[in-house]
């Protein structure tokens, strides 16, 4: 294992990371809707150009498979339940747009260059060491912090909204399965990673 600390906007760094391997797990992104609204330019540079850099570096290095993080945000404001992979919605943020574009690039690179890709649409991931005080904290660590402090958790709205939460261990398992699946029909698509 070699840790490479670099910026995915740097194509040479991406080439170094892809050299000599046959599988890429691409999890790097600016992963926040509020941050994407505040800074759509940097979000686009990192999440789209950085994604393409990693994908292109993989193609050039002969990587056989590219497993990447997508997002439930590709469903936009769709109220349709359950969320079905083939029916995405209208993106509601710059972050969501970047994830939609990434899925298009993955399909395009498979068609043009033959690299297999699997997108994983994460739904509200939570787990150990998630910072409840961070600027972009998810609701689960906020609820846990409130309960541990003997306070009632804050619920915005009237409580009628629902969310699907996914434990981080399930996300890891989904990545490992996507990286090792042998059925060719399971490749070159995106999957919902959610508890349901």
Each predicted region: which residue ranges?
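Conserved NAD(P)H cofactor-binding loop of Rossmann-fold oxidoreductase domains
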Residues: 27-31, 70
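N-terminal Rossmann-like NAD(P) cofactor-binding module of classical short-chain dehydrogenase/reductase
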Residues: 22-25, 67
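Conserved Rossmann-like nucleotide-binding pocket used by diverse enzymes
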Residues: 4, 14, 44, 118, ...
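Active-site beta-alpha loop architecture of Rossmann-like, nucleotide-cofactor-dependent enzymes
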Residues: 9, 30-34
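Conserved Rossmann-fold cofactor-binding substructure of NAD(P)-dependent oxidoreductases
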Residues: 1-23
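Alpha-helical substrate-binding/gating segment
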Residues: 125, 141-154, 163-191
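Catalytic helix-loop patch of NAD(P)-dependent Rossmann-fold dehydrogenases
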Residues: 38-56, 60, 64-65, 74-119, ...
């Amino acid at each position: 294992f070699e840790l490479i600390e670099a910026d995915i906007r740097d194509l040479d760094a991406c080439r170094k990371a892809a050299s000599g391997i046959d599988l890429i797990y691409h999890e790097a992104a600016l992963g926040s809707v509020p941050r994407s609204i505040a800074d759509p330019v940097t979000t686009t540079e990192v999440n789209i150009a950085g994604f393409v850099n990693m994908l292109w570096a993989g193609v050039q290095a002969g990587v056989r498979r590219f497993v990447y993080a997508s997002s439930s945000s590709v469903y936009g404001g769709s109220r349709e339940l359950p969320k079905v992979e083939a029916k995405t919605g209208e993106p509601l943020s710059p972050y969501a747009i970047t994830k939609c574009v990434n899925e298009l690039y993955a399909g395009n690179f498979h068609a043009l260059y033959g690299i297999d890709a699997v997108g994983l649409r994460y739904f509200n991931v939570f787990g150990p060491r998630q910072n409840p005080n961070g600027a972009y904290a998810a609701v689960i660590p906020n609820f846990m912090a409130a309960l541990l402090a003997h306070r009632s958790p804050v619920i915005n709205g009237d409580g009628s909204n629902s969310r699907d939460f996914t434990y981080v261990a399930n996300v890891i398992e989904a990545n490992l399965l996507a990286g090792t699946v042998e059925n060719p029909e399971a490749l070159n698509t995106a999957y919902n990673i959610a508890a349901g």
